[in-house]
Amino acid sequence: MDQDYEELRAKFTKIGLNETTVKDTLKNKKLSSSLNKVIEETNVGSSGCDRTIGNLLFTLANASLKQKDPKSNAHEAFIASKIVSGDLKTNLQVNAAITYCKDKDTIDESEFDKETGVGVVLTPEQIEQLVGDYVAENKSKILEQRYQLLNPSASALRQHALLKWAPQLEVKQTLDRKFLELLGPKTEQDAAAGKKKGAKAKNSKQKTVDSGKAKEQKIVSEQSKKYNMFEEGFLAKLHKPGGNTQLIPERMKEHLQATGGGVVTRFPPEPNGYLHIGHSKAIAVNFGFARYHNGVCYLRFDDTNPEAEEERYFESIKDLVAWLGFQPYKITYSSDYFDKLYELAEELIKRDKAYVCHCTDAEIKKARGGEERGPRYACVHRDRPIEESLLEFRNMRDGKYQPKEAILRMKQDLSDGNPQMWDLIAYRVLNSPHPRTGDKWKIYPTYDFTHCLVDSFENISHSLCTTEFILSRVSYEWLCNALEVYCPAQREYGRLNVVGTLMSKRKIMKLVKEGYVHGWNDPRLYTLVALRRRGVPPGAILEFVSEVGVTTAVSNIEVARFENCVRKFLENSVPRLMFLPDPIKVTLENLDDSYREQIEIPFNPKDPSMGSRSAFLTKHIYIDRSDFREEASSDFFRLTLGQPVGLFRASHPVVAKRVVKNDEGEPIEIIAEYDASSSKKPKTFIQWVSRDKESNSPVLIAETRLFNNLFKCDNPAALKEQELAAQLNPESEVVLKNSIIEPGIYDLIKSAPWPKTDSSAGVDKAENPESVRFQAMRVGYFCLDEDTKKPNHLVLNRIVSLREDSAKNKN
């Protein structure tokens, strides 16, 4: 036992742990065993390692003990190797690695590196810029709350997509300096505010209810303010046209002459799939920024991968941009510039800034440091003569090489800590025909080569993209400057994620192929075609993007917030109809068979411009089954035997007398009276639909589709493909077959689209069924589905429920 003790003590000491930690660890048998296992997996027990690596291995061993499921430690050796190789340098990265690997059967190393910040090296200048961007975006709040926002700002930056991997002391010092530059030294008022805040915290328990109400009121107040994302935050701080400096000043003169000094942006999707809710932000940012500044925006298809592109994706993207209310200045394609890009590739070779390489993927990875993140070195082809690379590149063009036998690489800077400078691939061989150029080309440019150069060709003033491309800004500028062309300004904002939804093309494709959803436009998905079919108006999506705002931080938004934004948009902008999901017949026995009372009902009492329609109260009407109970109770204010209820807009209440039931004892008809003698106002009013042949009432609904969350879990994005089916919510789609609605629905069909908005809130086509939107009173917001076969086969989709849903069954 003593020998084992001494061996472990020697091992723990060799990895740099201090004496106290070694002693404490040896007292804990489980921790000792776990740490020894980690050391053995990395072979540092005999050779030792520096203290930083040792402490990280200790963190891993300690975390492994806390995992309840043994499977969670399946990739412990892989994480340990990443620590020893220097890929994982901080506790934050190690913890991120543990979280990433927790439920993974296999590890995608490139995805692992992205999720754990491997290779993310921020220079002091980049930290200065990112912190400065954050302070600029929040300037108004900081000026108002001053140093009270310092600590919350530091917390926010610790969650930043890139800054969280940076040295936190350096980030904090930079933030402190930025606050000092903006606010000056702390004043007595700042100190008093801090004390006041502390005093409030001590009394918080006594004020829980009041503070909760105040917080709720504040949220409501803040949501009611109209936010313009182009006047505040990230987009308001962008440079003016001409404000991005050039390596060659003459290029800026040429650019401004071509653009007239205006804003020029672009939305550059890859036509390899359907757009999702996250893309709506990119559309709104790029097209909206140009529109706000009276500039222009290109719709440019980045069609450089013919193996994944299909015509249906091109058409869908065009259609959705128009649906969101934007008109491209021009629709262009990266393939439009293939000839020009090829010429510049040859020029890059002639400038000794590119070379043809024949290395395999594995050889390239190893030369970039490999899994061990060792030293980087040039491959044997890097210094080949210019003439030789030029000849080989032309051989690639002429089809003399098969895929992966030859590539063109940019000759960048392998010593740079940024992976985007490690001789990126510019051209590769592909044998697939292109949708637009056919078999003309055997080689195709990569995104890294194409994107910045086409931005340059189109004189883009603001190349706006998400923060995943921050590191790419260096290679973007390097290539433009290497060729001495105009260099647009790339600027990055945080992407939009709607939590609880699935965005992965691969995973959605699995659901589609296996029949779990009804295609890419299934209303339970968050693709834009699905949201459109569900009935979400384009203007509501734009309002949502604007409300969330544009900053450099990733926006992780709950589905509930998105749906609330849709509700607010629809509340006063669509007509209202009486709709009964589950109708039951009511016979008013004191009325004649010929009784027909005309009642004029506005489509929306808050907006007379929507007009009105006539409803006819007759002897036979229908109410919703949920609005009737045989026995009264103190919390139920609708119709019971003994409790009258008002009919919406009708002159008098109804009084239930008795119930007719079927053989199973279920109510199938209510016998009631229309009580003209009553002068007492009912406690509540319910919707109703008459049986009236003259007005073709009621209108039968073939299907009413109610949509709920597709998955049972809160984070389906974290599921593996094989786990998706088990987590599907069996109640995600509920179909009702016997619903009815009043004939006013036909008035809405004739006068669609609803709501009536200008093009800044999107463009609905009247002939599209989803443009017929309305509020089903006390039920929710609905639209017609594309399965509708007018006029006698109507299918409804619920867009969102009403806020009152949770309380409906109580009163």
Curated annotation (Swiss-Prot):
Indicate, by first and last residue, each region the UniProt record lists as having compositional bias (Basic residues): 194-205
| Documented EC number(s) | 6.1.1.18
Q: Which Gene3D superfamilies match?
A: 1.10.10.2420, Glutaminyl-tRNA synthetase, non-specific RNA binding region part 1, domain 1, HUPs, Ribosomal Protein L25, Chain P
**Ranges where the record places region Disordered:** 190-217
What are the subcellular locations of this protein? Answer: Cytoplasm
Can you tell me which residues bind ATP?
Answer: 270-272, 276-282, 466, 495-496, 503-505
**Which spans does this entry mark as compositional bias, Basic and acidic residues?**
207-217
Please name the Pfam families in this protein's record: tRNA-synt_1c (PF00749), tRNA-synt_1c_C (PF03950), tRNA-synt_1c_C2 (PF20974), tRNA_synt_1c_R1 (PF04558), tRNA_synt_1c_R2 (PF04557)
Q: Which InterPro entries match?
A: aa-tRNA-synth_I_CS, Gln-tRNA-synth, Gln-tRNA-synth_Ib_RNA-bd_2, Gln-tRNA-synth_Ib_RNA-bd_N, Gln-tRNA-synth_Ib_RNA-bd_N_1, Gln-tRNA-synth_Ib_RNA-bd_N_2, Gln/Glu-tRNA_Ligase, Glu/Gln-tRNA-synth
Tell me the GO molecular function terms. ATP binding; glutamine-tRNA ligase activity
Q: Which GO terms describe its biological process?
A: cytoplasmic translation; glutaminyl-tRNA aminoacylation
Keywords, ordered alphabetically: Aminoacyl-tRNA synthetase, ATP-binding, Cytoplasm, Ligase, Nucleotide-binding, Protein biosynthesis
Q: Where is the signal peptide?
A: none
Kindly state the positions of the motif 'KMSKS' region in this protein: 502-506
Q: Specify where it is mainly localized.
A: cytoplasm
Can you tell me which residues bind L-glutamine?
A: 302, 447
A single GO cellular-component term from the record reads: cytosol
- Report the family membership: Belongs to the class-I aminoacyl-tRNA synthetase family.
Q: What is this protein called?
A: Probable glutamine--tRNA ligase
The source organism is: Schizosaccharomyces pombe (strain 972 / ATCC 24843)
